[in-house]
A protein has these predicted regions:
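A structural signal for the main folded, soluble domain(s) of proteins
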Residues: 18, 26-29, 33, 56, ...
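Short boundary/linker motifs that mark transitions into or out of structured domains
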Residues: 149, 153-216, 266-277, 318
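Helix-turn-helix repeat elements of alpha-solenoid scaffolds
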Residues: 1-9, 37-48, 77-88, 124-125, ...
Length: 427
């Protein structure tokens, strides 16, 4: 047995021991404050608990308090301060019965690395955490909102230890934030890009007998409406425009109920104060994930790179509802998403070209054009890339392809800008 296993604090001392009652009281206040999101208060209570645990000689309590403090401070504190705190906790738990809780500290370190833009180092830290034995119960990290979900979401995106990560999420009922990826074990997944599909608990949701068309149309409308949903009156006007107002509102209520039954989870669809919405804590929607990615890739926001472009194309498997929805609201939303994919790929491609990675940019443009062969700006970008690579003949082939598609499908000529670019290629 390692010497540390015999340290005082292995068992709870009597509550009459100096500092014990104060430590437990502060710890309780810390947990409540952390779980309710009052983080400044949580930090104060945690520091008080740490001091009292040390006074009482409660080794395990002091270690847990340090883990909690590191997690609380991780989003905003200077890196040097956090690493010093984590290093001290690691040193204190080394060769003791608490050493397996280094898992939690490694995960906090990974969060800091992600925050600071060191994604490769974060991946290494998560892999080390997953290799620790025995397995930690992540108790203190589960007390702190955002930190643990963000780490687990990163691991899933990077395909690190997905089995263990998903097991933790399920075992400890960890809810993903709105930015959690598709790989998160969402209760409901709604796919609308490239066609419509539903999944529950990672299995395709199929229908026996008649397809519930109106509840599914309601769901598609709610996707178009975004996370805030729509007033019931607006839903009635869009789905039952020719029905008397009160009867149309009754139809909304009826089909909300039917949709919940279809999904198998009543809480997946929220209805409150005359407004209906998809619950983002229960449901993942591919179109919304794509929109968030597009928003983060705009000039002036996060730097667009090949990763962003690849992620966008992984999500954008085709146009919204694959052209099957011809209602005005579906057509409008489809157009919005098509503009997003063009803009996002352009931003990512421009970043690649700026770094001299013209071949990677050209591949990105080709992938996007395979999804939307009417996106004239992407033809131009691809032509620029090929010209930079000295492939003038290929660039002219791209122009002819663009001209043919626009003529056949839309009955129009390429823009003057595209024609001018082609003219420079012929010179």
């Amino acid at each position: 047995m390692a010497p540390g296993n015999t340290l005082p604090g292995c068992v709870w001392p009597p509550l009459t021991t100096p500092g014990v009652a104060r430590a437990m009281c502060s710890l309780s206040h810390f947990i409540v404050a952390a779980c309710t999101g009052t983080l400044e208060s949580a930090v104060g209570h945690n520091r008080a608990a740490l001091e009292a645990f040390r006074e009482a000689g409660m080794f395990f309590g002091a270690i847990n308090a340090q883990i909690g403090l590191a997690a609380l401070l991780a989003p905003t504190a200077p890196t040097e301060e956090l690493i010093a705190l984590i290093s001290r906790a690691k040193e204190e738990m080394r060769d003791t019965y608490m050493q397996h809780h280094e898992t939690q500290l490694l995960l906090v370190e990974a969060f800091i690395a992600i925050r600071d833009g060191h994604r490769d180092h974060a991946a290494v830290l998560i892999e080390r955490a997953l290799a620790m034995r025995p397995v930690s119960d992540l108790y203190m990290l589960r007390m702190v909102p955002h930190v643990l979900p963000d780490i687990l979401a990163f691991a899933l995106r990077e395909r690190i230890g997905q089995g263990r990560i998903r097991q933790w999420i399920t075992q400890y009922c960890i809810r993903g934030g709105r930015d959690a990826p598709e790989q998160w074990p969402w209760p409901i997944k709604i796919r609308t890009l490239g066609g419509f599909g539903l999944g529950r608990d990672d299995r395709p949701l199929s229908f026996k007998g008649k397809i519930p068309r109106k509840p599914l149309e309601l769901l598609k409308l709610l996707v178009c409406a975004g996370e805030e949903g729509l007033p019931a009156r607006a839903i009635a006007d869009k789905l039952w425009p020719d029905v008397e107002a009160d009867a149309a509102l009754n139809n909304v209520d009826t089909n909300v109920h039917r949709l919940r039954k279809v999904l198998g989870i009543d809480t997946a669809i929220k209805s409150s104060q005359g407004r209906v919405a998809i619950d983002t804590s229960q449901c993942w929607v591919d179109a919304w994930a794509f929109e968030r990615l597009a928003a983060n890739s705009e000039p002036g926001r996060k730097i667009a790179d090949a990763t962003q472009g690849t992620l966008a194309l992984e999500l954008y498997r085709g146009h919204f509802l694959n052209e099957e929805g011809e209602q005005a609201w579906a057509v409008a939303y489809r157009g919005q998403l098509r503009r997003h994919i063009v803009s996002l790929v352009q931003n990512a491609g421009t970043a690649l070209q700026r770094n001299g990675e013209t071949r990677a940019a050209a591949k990105l443009y080709e992938r996007a054009l395979a999804l939307d062969n009417l996106a004239e700006p992407l033809y131009r970008d691809l032509m620029h890339c090929l010209r930079e690579q000295g492939e003038t003949a290929e660039a002219l082939k791209v122009y002819r392809r663009c001209k043919e598609m626009l003529s056949i499908v839309l009955g129009i000529e390429p823009s003057k800008e595209t024609q001018a670019l082609a003219a420079t290629l012929r010179d």
